[in-house]
Amino acid sequence: MRQFLKNFALIAIGLIAGVAATVQLSATAQQGAQLPLDELRTLSNVFAQIKREYVEPIEDKQLLTDAVKGMVSSLDPHSTFLDKKDFAEMQEMTSGKFAGLGIEITSEDGVVKVLNPIEDSPAARAGLQAGDLITRLDDKPVRGMSLDKAVRTMRGEPGTKITLTIFRKSEERSFPVTITRAEIKVQSVKTKILDNDIAWVRITSFQERTVPDLAKKLTEIANQDPKLKGIILDLRNNGGGLLQGAVGVAAAFLPADAVIVSTKGQSADSKQVFNATPAMYRLNEAGDPLAGVPAIFKKLPMVVLVNAYSASASEIVAGALQDYKRATIIGKTTFGKGSVQTVRPLTNDSALKITTAYYYTPSGKSIQAFGVKPDIPVDQNKDGDPDDVLITREIDSEKHLRNKQSAEDKLIKDREQRRLEELQRIEEKNAKKTPEEKEKEKNKKPPELGSADDFMLSQAVAFINGQPVKRSSSKLE
């Protein structure tokens, strides 16, 4: 187990201009399984035929690399082959510092979709929003471009510029945005004390420094305000990160030795249980990074804020705190990525990222495809979030892994029906807008999380204060 924890472990979604997801496990299932010789012979014959007859010469390395990528990516949305550059970028991202635009992206309908602009990044300052579709990178169309190539095109030297062509579904318009690349330093833990002695703790991603940084911030908060009466853990737009980070964050608020998450897959080493013990969450620290956290944080009334972009490691934390009834979950149903990916280094500095297990909350529930449902569904905007139906969750992903505990067909059908209804409603609404209203919407930005205009946060504060909370009326919640 200790050897496992020394390995590269992360759980996330998407590519963060770019990188992805995972948990490192150390064994291979069915090592003694017989090789499918006939199928391998067919592969060899196809390779030879291409080399002999293709219209132009093609390098062996390119042909075989593309074959491996196709083989792995056909499994599910999260398995992929990482070449030298991809693997290096993944390792760079977990350190919390990289160069680029600062957006988490995925692929949808042949184009690139923005999952989340990283806070205080060039992309966020340029006004990019979750759900925006990127159709062109400078003069190059994105359709037909691999996600890896799109990521590499967007990354670059700090100070250089790139123009993205954006299609925003909610406004039915396309427009160019020129962004200057910069070194992205992701501050994963942000805190402040709100009115009425309530602490707001925002975690943007789970990185190497997240647990010790959280411990430091919690200690500072307790010293600043000895009269604290509640804490709000904000996991909105958090696409995941290091597994140890998720275990450590949950451990800060749960009893010692509490089960945080378990994983189960085909191999023996994929069957693991992660508890609230230092050995399970410390990375580079000699002792327990949570040792100095005031005991009050184990008992304070607590709310966890989530939305459709809270995924993977975020869902582990929310699911654990919900199962133990340690916190009330407020917001929207989470993304629903309940699978574990192994990053296994290969030769030539490449790696294989492959789904090896499902993960389960302490009660044994799988959130795969369904996500973590909030105890109190609340909209991000006071007047509702009709555009939420356009958000792609795990269950909408092509080739997503099915949840073995629950039937998905009805939910998929209901979501598709609601999506069609909302698209029609949006089109009708946009058709009635005046030019002035359309121009005003172009300049409208979503409220900054943690600001005075953050409606969902205001409802979390109301809940802790014992005041009424405006529940979402969405049929999907």
Give the ranges of each region predicted by the language model.
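Flexible, low-complexity junctional segments that flank or bridge functional domains
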Residues: M1-I231, L235-G239, L243-G245, A252-P255, ...
